[in-house]
UniProtKB/Swiss-Prot annotation:
Induction notes from the record: Repressed under conditions of excess protein secretion capacity and derepressed when protein secretion becomes limiting. This is regulated by SecM.
Cofactor: Zn(2+)
Ligand binding (Zn(2+)): 885, 887, 896-897
Molecular functions per Gene Ontology: ATP binding; metal ion binding; protein-exporting ATPase activity
Species the sequence originates in: Citrobacter koseri (strain ATCC BAA-895 / CDC 4225-83 / SGSC4696)
Function, as annotated: Part of the Sec protein translocase complex. Interacts with the SecYEG preprotein conducting channel. Has a central role in coupling the hydrolysis of ATP to the transfer of proteins into and across the cell membrane, serving both as a receptor for the preprotein-SecB complex and as an ATP-driven molecular motor driving the stepwise translocation of polypeptide chains across the membrane.
Xref: PROSITE patterns: SECA (PS01312), SECA_MOTOR_DEAD (PS51196)
CC per GO annotation: cell envelope Sec protein transport complex; cytosol; plasma membrane
Statement: the UniProt record of this protein carries the keyword Lipid metabolism: no
Protein name: Protein translocase subunit SecA
GO biological process: intracellular protein transmembrane transport; protein import; protein targeting; protein transport by the Sec complex
Family, per entry: Belongs to the SecA family.
Span list, region Disordered: 852-901
Length: 901
């Protein structure tokens, strides 16, 4: 009550922000007559003038009124479009490191030209980020004439472009591209073998379109670049045969319920758990198939990979459905994006899940992958000096934007008042009743000439509605992942009188639905249209436009509530753009996923008590409220998941930053000999310490062991025992110095053979390659640690703290291994002539290129089988107590990690 009263007196934070910005809008409007008087050349010359002023120390903020006035005037001359006052407000919000919530049809693309131009003046580059390649290309081509008129260069960054073209795109003042491609380029730059291979500049200003989709919907899944691991396709096939023998249990086991099934499914967490009975049965079946030895347990350390295969197969059968989560096309399993309904060609699930789905569908199983580099969108976008975004729906997620990205959300008012009618939800008992009611509604509306857009949450649901419409003889277009190519054309004509369009989720987002259809699309179909033809098409369109407005505008039907209120609002937002008429309604049933999982039995109980007959719907504020509460629950759960992912990824992020900084410094220098000399001293000290403990008696020295180690790991033949026999006065310190001096001498002889320049080149190559190889293994080990760390909670320990502690010690061990491997490799390499080093370099380059071609880019669930694979590889061979410890510390196993066991 008090807060409401204070808001009434002082206005909300949003009102105060807009009030402050409206003063600047007044100044920009006052400059308009002055700008109109300028010739084209004088207007273009403003860009150079602004750049000089910035160099002299003026701030970007001080240029806002003039720069915005220049862009508005240029837009009038190039496009014949004048920025509305609300678009100027939006531009200021975006420059202010905030998120601008602007309704659909309010011209976000044109608004973005203002802050993009302003921030490109510094010459550091602006990245405009869109959700797909089509929008990136469309927006770049649409805005190119405006920016080029003002003397700015425009680049497009698309997947599959060669490195020189990418470098050129990034060197432009303003670059358009997709979120995935920017992230992958960052990872690839940090895997480059020479400074020339890098494509990105320093990350300066990112302007994210559909910011909610990119920074929230896709934030749970990291970007991963992976390379091939070993082939285990046969195992997937064998395990896949076993799964159909298992029976699903309806509910999870608890104190009150002990089921009879073999596995239970937790739909909320998207996890599958074996029951006691299931474990016994699966172990029997594995023994019968000859996959596991009799008397062994699935949970024994030696069967860790087998457990991984069983879990992946169970998840593939119980949680992933064809035509909902993926489609099978040309013998390939293609993932369907749950947020947009689009297919994600070339993307693969990790953790062996994709292989398990391939086995289930009987298509060819492709090799598993090992993570080479990964980053989450949260951490990638936080690398930019300045970040801003725009969307039609951000207010429901304002808290998350603020707490994770430090971005405030500002709701920008619409240019014209919104008059769309949002009707209450109708809830039916069964799916069939709901579909029937939707068909009746469509019939009624199209009879009046009103266009209808039906939003579904999966391909499967869109095909169910499509089949029913076909039976009813209603002509319609289907827009889902299977018909990706016609997307923009179908969306553009969805406003045609009596048109019926079915769209999965938010497919076609970013394309306006114009009431009466798009006359531009009709003109584009004619080869050489005459002015008369164009005038006729426009006149016909005007008639259709008026007819659609009279029938009530575009009607939106939602066939199911989405987990997030925001995505429901996006669907509604396709109608009622720029003050047009429109309406919307959601049809639900008690069989919908959201209702089944979250709206509990209470609502269905209430519906039964009301004595509902088949085909009847309930329409009540209580029900709508119960659904909104269910959605809030899901939203807060998803927020917690993303927050937790971020907290864990922050640990990896600190390490990633340290490694990438080190790697870039290494790339930029040509001589690393000083570093090599310094780490050689460290490595030899640690190695000698393992056999000659500091300040110890001679009886405690293990000289034969040391000689053998130096020979095996560093290819050094040193008669240490002979030295000690001949020189009794040779004490520990002098001996250490002599061993190091001898190793340096041998190395220098190698250098004399090949020449200093060639050796420096070779040292740098070895260092980069070793760093990449160990970092890859470290990522796998971190994934593996992450998967099991939650179990520490049972020991009353905080899993996050444990993860931080252990990952830090793993990182320290990796750095020690790096030193050891580099010195060992450089010591062991045999060179007799310069050509041999050149041949090795060539071989290394070819191997790097081969791996680059085999790399796979994925944006998927945050877990990796690579880790488990690595653990299994190292778990096969038992380490002897006197062997060097595998951690690379240089100590014996019994004096290092062997002590723990």
């Amino acid at each position: 009550m008090l807060i409401k009263l204070l808001t009434k007196v002082f206005g909300s934070r949003n009102d105060r922000t807009l009030r402050r910005m409206r003063k600047a809008v007044g100044i920009i409007n006052a400059m308009e007559p002055e700008m109109e008087k300028l010739s084209d050349d004088e207007l273009k010359g403003k860009t150079a003038e602004f750049r000089v002023r910035l160099e002299k120390g003026e701030s970007v903020e001080s240029l806002i009124p003039e720069a915005f006035a220049v862009v508005r005037e240029a837009s009038k001359r190039v496009f014949g479009m004048r920025h509305f006052d609300v678009q100027l407000l939006g531009g200021m919000v975006l420059n202010d490191r905030c998120i601008a919530e602007m309704r659909t049809g309010e011209g976000k693309t044109l608004t973005a030209t203002l802050p993009a131009y302003l921030n490109a003046l510094s010459g550091k580059g602006v990245h405009v980020v869109t959700v797909n390649d089509y929008l990136a290309q469309r927006d770049a081509e649409n805005n190119r004439p405006l920016f080029e008129f003002l003397g700015m260069s425009v680049g497009i960054n698309l997947p599959g472009m060669p490195a020189p073209a990418k470098r050129e795109a990034y060197a432009a003042d303003i670059t358009y591209g997709t979120n995935n491609e920017y992230g992958f380029d960052y990872l690839r730059d940090n895997m480059a073998f020479s400074p020339e291979e890098r494509v990105q500049r320093k990350l300066h200003y990112a302007l994210v379109d559909e910011v909610d989709s990119i920074l929230i919907d896709e934030a749970r899944t990291p970007l991963i670049i992976s390379g091939p691991a070993e082939d285990s396709s046969e195992m997937y096939k064998k395990v896949n045969k076993i799964i159909p023998h298992l029976i699903r249990q309806e509910k999870e086991d608890s104190d009150t319920f002990q089921g009879e099934g073999h596995f239970s499914v937790d739909e909320k967490a998207r996890q599958v758990n074996l029951t006691e009975r299931g474990l016994v049965l699966i172990e029997e079946l594995l023994v019968k198939e000859g996959i596991m030895d009799e008397g062994e347990s699935l949970y024994s350390p030696g069967n860790i990979m087998l457990m991984h295969h069983v879990t992946a197969a169970l998840r593939a059968h119980a949680l992933f459905t064809r035509d909902v989560d993926y489609i099978v096309k040309d013998g390939e399993v293609i993932i369907v994006d749950e947020h947009t309904g689009r297919t994600m060609q070339g993307r693969r699930w990790s953790d062996g899940l994709h292989q398990a789905v391939e086995a289930k569908e009987g298509v060819e199983i492709q090799n598993e992958n090992q993570t080479l580099a990964s980053i989450t969108f949260q951490n990638y976008f936080r690398l930019y000096e300045k970040l801003a975004g725009m969307t039609g729906t951000a207010d429901t997620e304002a808290f998350e934007f603020s707490s994770i990205y430090k971005l405030d959300t500002v709701v920008v008012p619409t240019n014209r008042p919104m008059i769309r009618k949002d009707m209450p939800d109708l809830v039916y008992m069964t799916e069939a009743e709901k579909i029937q009611a939707i068909i009746e509604d469509i019939k009624e509306r199209t009879a009046n000439g009103q266009p209808v857009l039906v939003g579904t949450i999966s391909i499967e649901k869109s095909e169910v509605v499509s089949n029913e419409l076909t039976k009813a003889g209603i002509k319609h277009n289907v827009l889902n992942a299977k018909f990706h190519a016609n997307e923009a054309a179908i969306v553009a004509q969805a406003g045609y009188p009596a048109a019926v369009t079915i769209a999965t989720n938010m497919a076609g987002r970013g394309t306006d639905i114009v009431l009466g259809g798009s006359w531009q699309a009709e003109v584009a179909e004619l080869e050489n249209p005459t002015p008369e033809q164009i005038a006729q098409i426009k006149a016909d369109w005007q008639v259709r436009h008026e007819a659609v407005l009279a029938s009530g505008g575009l009607h939106i039907i939602g066939t199911e509530r989405h987990e997030s209120r925001r995505i429901d609002n996006q669907l509604r937002g396709r109608s009622g753009r720029q003050g047009d008429a429109g309406s919307s309604r959601f049809y639900l049933s008690m069989e919908d996923a959201l209702m089944r999982i979250f709206a509990s039995d209470r609502v269905s109980g209430m519906m039964r008590k009301l004595g509902m007959k088949p085909g009847e719907a309930i329409e009540h504020p209580w029900v709508t409220k119960a659904i909104a509460n269910a959605q809030r629950k899901v939203e807060s759960r998803n927020f917690d998941i993303r927050k937790q992912l971020l907290e864990y990824d922050d640990v990896a992020n600190d390490q990633r930053r340290a490694i990438y900084t080190q790697r870039n410094e290494l790339l930029d220098v040509s001589d690393v000999s000083e570093t090599i000399n310094s780490i050689r001293e460290d490595v030899f000290k640690v190695t000698i310490d393992a056999y000659i403990p500091p300040q110890s008696l001679e009886e405690m020295w293990d000289i034969p062991g040391l000689q053998e180690r130096l020979k095996n790991d560093f290819d050094l033949d040193m008669p240490i025992a002979e030295w000690l026999d001949k020189e009794p006065e040779l004490h520990e310190e002098t001996l250490r110095e002599r061993i190091l001096a001898h190793s340096i001498e041998v190395y220098q002889r190698k250098e004399e053979v090949v020449g200093a320049e060639m050796m420096r080149h070779f040292e740098k190559g070895v260092m980069l390659q070793t760093l990449d190889s160990l970092w890859k293994e470290h990522l796998a080990a971190m994934d593996y640690l992450r998967q099991g760390i939650h179990l520490r909670g049972y020991a009353q320990k905080d899993p996050k703290q444990e993860y931080k502690r252990e990952s830090f010690s793993m990182f320290a061990a990796m750095l020690e291994s790096l030193k050891y491997e580099v010195v060992s490799t450089l010591s062991k390499v045999q060179v007799r002539m310069p050509e041999e080093v050149e041949a090795m370099e060539q071989q290394r380059r070819e191997e790097a290129e081969r791996l680059a071609q085999m790399q796979q880019l994925s944006h998927q669930d945050d877990d990796s089988a690579a880790a488990a694979a690595l653990a299994a590889q190292t778990g096969d061979r038992k380490v002897g107590r006197n062997d060097p410890c595998p951690c690379g510390s240089g100590k014996k196993y019994k004096q290092c990690h062997g002590r723990l066991s």
